[in-house]
From Swiss-Prot:
Induction: Repressed by cold treatment. This is Transcription factor BIM1. Homodimer. Interacts with BZR2/BES1 through both C-terminal and bHLH domains. Also interacts with LHW. InterPro entries: bHLH_dom, BIM1/2/3, HLH_DNA-bd_sf. Residues 76-86 have a biased composition (Pro residues). It comes from Arabidopsis thaliana (Mouse-ear cress). PROSITE patterns: BHLH. Residues 426-438 have a biased composition (Low complexity). Residues 1-91, 245-291, 425-450, 491-529 are annotated as: Disordered. Positive brassinosteroid-signaling protein. Transcription factor that bind specifically to the DNA sequence 5'-CANNTG-3'(E box). Can bind individually to the promoter as a homodimer or synergistically as a heterodimer with BZR2/BES1. Does not itself activate transcription but enhances BZR2/BES1-mediated target gene activation.
């Protein structure tokens, strides 16, 4: 049965069947630009014979046409091969390499340097099968400036399986060599010897003509170029990622080794004392504990009825309670004064002295207390505005001329403890007699405390009386027939307590300055013996 035949591209008589089959046979292999002319000896009576004829000789025609097409495609782009003994200089001027043909391949091959992938080398599956069986192609690639020159080649069809194994082995060795060249671990001579040994062992290791292998070699070239500082960036395949991960793992391992070494050096016996916590039995810790124990022992001696067997927390609580008790006891005597301040810097110690000498009465005297003002805080002076201790003049109190300045009357020797926050102090006596016993003075002090008046420090009183007696004796006054009376006012301004020469000042309560406001009713104390 004869199939309907379409018109050929060019009408050539009465042979449409032969033209149709010849076009189909050529279209399966490679589209030829020049169609094959049909034989002229075929006539209309050979239609069945023409239909079966391509089935008999299509194999030979396909082989010849495909070999011719691949040969022309491979021979068009590359330049002519250099002579065999010619030496080439490696990129960067590192060394030279020589390409020499193998004896049993010189009549088939042409060396085609292929730095980049060219479009004519892309084949489909049928063409790759034909090339694996009937042709041997050479493919060479240049590595970067630091890598050597490596050739890949395919062997004959009889050594097909062995060639692919050698190709995989050689490719792995070359990949390792390229990676090592990138890291900088192998010298150039060793890489060259490695590549030459690989070529000597496997001849020319054949590279598979599949697209994946070509892309792998191209991506390795790009990786080496990027390691050398070029700006070209291409996508890397899975095997490159694996190699880069392996390199990063080796780099991280080297960093770990460095860190371990540094940690070992840092943990040397010399610096071990600084890093480790202080030992319980060290000499420094023992000294610190002994100091703490000594100070706790001092506290236990100060606090009455303290238990030696109590722990430190309970003992500190007992100390706090005792301090609070002392503060309450101190506040009991000074709550009537507004100048009481709880700040530790302004709290002044006070120590009463029982050996107190009384000032004799008979002389009205109001000195200027400059030294006392320097020793008493301002807050204490501010609250002493209304505190006035006045002594009325008696019959024995007679004025007498004294040409003595206030500074020469007394230079109070305040030794020992400074003047505290007690605001008024008076020491008076009616006659110059030996000081009474300490028991009577203690009783008198207790009475004054109950009345709200507190005596001044005996040290200051003794200095004042001594200076006054010396001044009176120098002026010719008989102290055995005279009585001395002393008035002291503590206020902000010292002008109200200034001394007037050649006259005896009236009581301060009568001649108080108008600018000093009286905060409360003044208390007067009359003392005498």
């Amino acid at each position: 049965m004869e199939l309907p035949q379409p018109r050929p591209f060019k009408t050539q008589g009465r042979k449409p069947t032969h033209d149709f089959l010849s076009l189909c046979s050529h279209s399966t292999v490679h589209p030829d630009p020049k169609p094959t002319p049909p034989p002229s000896s075929q006539g209309s009576h050979l239609k069945t014979h023409d239909f079966l004829q391509p089935l008999e000789c299509v194999g030979a025609k396909e082989d010849v046409s495909r070999i011719n097409s691949t040969t022309t495609a491979s021979e068009k782009p590359p330049p002519p091969a250099p002579p065999p003994p010619l030496q080439h200089v490696l990129p960067g001027g590192i060394g030279t390499y020589t390409i020499s043909p193998i004896p049993y391949f010189h009549h088939h091959h042409q060396r085609i340097p292929k730095p980049e992938l060219s479009p004519p080398m892309m084949f489909n599956a049928n063409e790759r099968n034909v090339l694996d069986e009937n042709s041997n192609s050479n493919c060479s690639s240049y590595a970067a400036a630091s890598s050597g020159f490596t050739l890949w080649d395919e062997s004959a069809s009889g050594k097909k399986g062995q060639t692919r194994k050698e190709n995989s082995v050689g490719e792995r060795v070359n990949m390792r060599a390229d990676v090592a060249a990138t890291v900088g671990q192998w010298p150039v001579a060793e890489r060259r010897s490695q590549s030459l040994t690989n070529n000597h062992m496997s001849g020319f290791s054949s590279l598979s003509s599949s697209q994946g292998s070509v892309l792998k070699s191209q991506s390795f070239m790009d990786m080496i170029r990027s390691a050398k500082g070029s700006s070209q960036e291409d996508d890397l395949d899975d095997e490159e990622d694996f190699i880069m991960k392996k390199e990063s793992s080796s780099t991280s391992q080297s960093h770990r080794v460095d860190l371990r070494v540094k940690a070992d050096v840092r943990g040397s016996p010399n610096d071990q004392k600084l890093n480790t916590p202080r030992s319980k039995h060290s000499a420094t810790e023992q000294r610190r504990r002994s100091k703490i124990n000594d100070r706790f022992q001092m506290l236990r001696q100060l606090i009455p009825n303290s238990d030696q067997k109590r722990d430190k927390a309970s003992f500190l609580l007992e100390v706090i309670e005792y301090i609070q008790f002392l503060q309450e006891k101190a506040d009991k005597y000074v709550t009537s004064y507004q100048g009481w301040n709880h700040e530790p810097a302004k709290l002044l110690n006070w120590q009463s002295n029982n050996n107190q000498q009384l000032v004799p009465e008979g002389v009205a005297f109001a000195p200027k207390l400059e030294e006392e003002k320097n020793n008493i805080p301002v807050s204490v002076l501010a609250t002493a505005q209304g505190v006035v201790i006045d002594h009325p003049t008696t019959a024995t109190t007679s004025p007498f001329p004294l040409s003595i300045q206030s500074n020469s009357f007394f230079s109070p020797v305040i030794a020992g403890n400074p003047v505290p926050q007690f605001h008024a102090r008076v020491a008076s006596s009616e006659a110059v007699e030996p000081s009474p016993s300490s028991r009577s003075q203690k009783e008198e002090e207790d009475e004054e405390v109950l009345e709200g008046n507190i005596r001044i420090s005996s040290v200051y009183s003794q200095g004042l009386v001594k200076t006054l007696r010396e001044a009176l004796e120098n002026s010719g006054v008989d102290l055995t027939k005279a009585s001395i009376s002393v008035e002291i006012e503590l206020a902000k301004q010292s002008s109200s307590s200034s001394f007037k020469d050649h006259e005896v000042r009236e009581p301060v309560s009568r001649t108080r300055n108008d600018n000093v406001k009286q905060t409360r009713k003044p208390k007067r104390l009359k003392t005498g013996q």
